[in-house]
Amino acid sequence: MGRSLKKGPFVDEHLMKKVEAQANDEKKKVIKTWSRRSTIFPSFIGYTIAVYDGRKHVPVYIQEDMVGHKLGEFAPTRTYKGHAADDKKTRRK
């Protein structure tokens, strides 16, 4: 179930302040955040936001087609190493 339209999209205030502060600077630095729940706004386009995945910050370059999605969608939290190999030689009969 999505968020109500009357509420509007959610973004953490501290993240919005960091993006607005960098809008004045010429050089765009990587913005670190723990806020995976924040919605990507059109003003974020062109910035690199490092989203925390539980172990490290994953750099995510914001593009136009990402607007409206959540930051956490682009920083997976689980690493899939694949299923165990089916080694028939070592199996007992």
UniProtKB/Swiss-Prot annotation:
Entry's Gene Ontology molecular function annotations: rRNA binding; structural constituent of ribosome
Gene3D superfamilies given in the database record: 30s Ribosomal Protein S19, Chain A
Keywords, in A-Z order: Ribonucleoprotein, Ribosomal protein, RNA-binding, rRNA-binding
SUPFAM superfamilies xref list: Ribosomal protein S19
GO BP terms, alphabetized: ribosomal small subunit assembly; translation
InterPro entries assigned to the protein according to its UniProt record, in alphabetical order: Ribosomal_uS19 (IPR002222), Ribosomal_uS19_bac-type (IPR005732), Ribosomal_uS19_CS (IPR020934), Ribosomal_uS19_SF (IPR023575)
Family: Belongs to the universal ribosomal protein uS19 family.
HAMAP family: Ribosomal_uS19 (MF_00531)
Main function: Protein S19 forms a complex with S13 that binds strongly to the 16S ribosomal RNA.
Name the record gives this protein: Small ribosomal subunit protein uS19
Lineage, uppermost ranks: Bacteria, Bacillati, Bacillota, Bacilli, Lactobacillales
Gene that encodes the chain: rpsS
